[in-house]
UniProtKB/Swiss-Prot annotation:
Modified residues (N6-(2-hydroxyisobutyryl)lysine): 171
Residues at which NADP(+) 1 binds: 38-45, 72, 147, 171
Remarks, miscellaneous: Binds two molecules of NADP. The first one is a cosubstrate (bound to the N-terminal domain), the second is bound to the C-terminal domain and functions as a structural element.
Species annotation: Homo sapiens (Human)
Protein name listed in UniProt: Glucose-6-phosphate 1-dehydrogenase
Amino acid sequence: MAEQVALSRTQVCGILREELFQGDAFHQSDTHIFIIMGASGDLAKKKIYPTIWWLFRDGLLPENTFIVGYARSRLTVADIRKQSEPFFKATPEEKLKLEDFFARNSYVAGQYDDAASYQRLNSHMNALHLGSQANRLFYLALPPTVYEAVTKNIHESCMSQIGWNRIIVEKPFGRDLQSSDRLSNHISSLFREDQIYRIDHYLGKEMVQNLMVLRFANRIFGPIWNRDNIACVILTFKEPFGTEGRGGYFDEFGIIRDVMQNHLLQMLCLVAMEKPASTNSDDVRDEKVKVLKCISEVQANNVVLGQYVGNPDGEGEATKGYLDDPTVPRGSTTATFAAVVLYVENERWDGVPFILRCGKALNERKAEVRLQFHDVAGDIFHQQCKRNELVIRVQPNEAVYTKMMTKKPGMFFNPEESELDLTYGNRYKNVKLPDAYERLILDVFCGSQMHFVRSDELREAWRIFTPLLHQIELEKPKPIPYIYGSRGPTEADELMKRVGFQYEGTYKWVNPHKL
């Protein structure tokens, strides 16, 4: 194996930036203003401010970039610094750079539905160096209930008249098809589609982005990536912790809206889509939309819903169930686990079940895509062979591995399960991978929308799940209880077995490399 040359974080992201621009220069001479709407909130202090700091520290932001925080709270830059700096992971050697970063920060207090507040924000931005000509990037780190008022006021009072204007919208993008359509229609009446960046941070993860390269840059996968060879596809998202005092927010949306309708469905698209004409943003998103249009609405008999209960043998939080969270409404029937089977009704995937599983308080932290292949025809090993699987492990410990049969070492001629393994932490141990938010925010500065959700994608995603969500809200079925720290309801395993997935339980991938 060739030795990897150590690359700094700046070099890695710089290469990415060069790829995004396809050789064009990154316009360091332009003035940019990055406006964080909702600057006093958790998302801002834990994710957005740290991400902007990392990009600034590594020289990846345009040279003349200013950061403006906006929220209702009467704060100062010192307050913002106190809240967010613990998440920066800054070293003592970066002290001067940190001072330079906060010197570029400012803060404006104002209401979200008050025109005068936005006029004051605009005056503040115009007063910055070349601020009236600056490119403006608005990050809506806000609850969706204020999106309409905020976007309307931004459009009326805060748009740059010379530079470009871009807006980043955080999920949830509505609660169902109808509310999503209303929000999309409102935002699209104010901004062009090329100005709107609907962010799903999973699309910024290394292994999710690797799906396209894995599929379309390797000849070996093309002939087998179809219904003739693949028996089923399993997309999994597991968290080993519960709501831990944040159940009030979660209860409003539930696990399907929180994870399945966005993260897992986006990964499904990348697995199932046809080869795009190019890596141009719209070429890629066109193919994703085609996949979604081939998926029918979820059928109730292909759904299992669960809710975690305390583990009597556990410790600490593990002893508490979802309903023990004081922020959760008493008697809530909101699901913390869901397993859903979808079918892509086209020539490539006809009859192949796509199984989406996600949940809280499960036995491990894991997100992965697993393709299970059909049994080998003409078995000569007396049913000792297990199905081959290709696994793309998104988190933790990014990896691609193929589960396959090899001869068991020794005197006997017996097959046993093993794997061909590419663990990123070992093969690329000197490469510093950018955080998902770093990659995506850099994409917005560069104007690349490939890893953002287009309005027609969003509409099709909600079309698939809205009837099920409405049925759940109307009938309020009681979710199946499962123990904190388990694999989830056994009924989910039974559903997967019914549609064709074979779970042997005899093999578990173990990271073979000390990271």
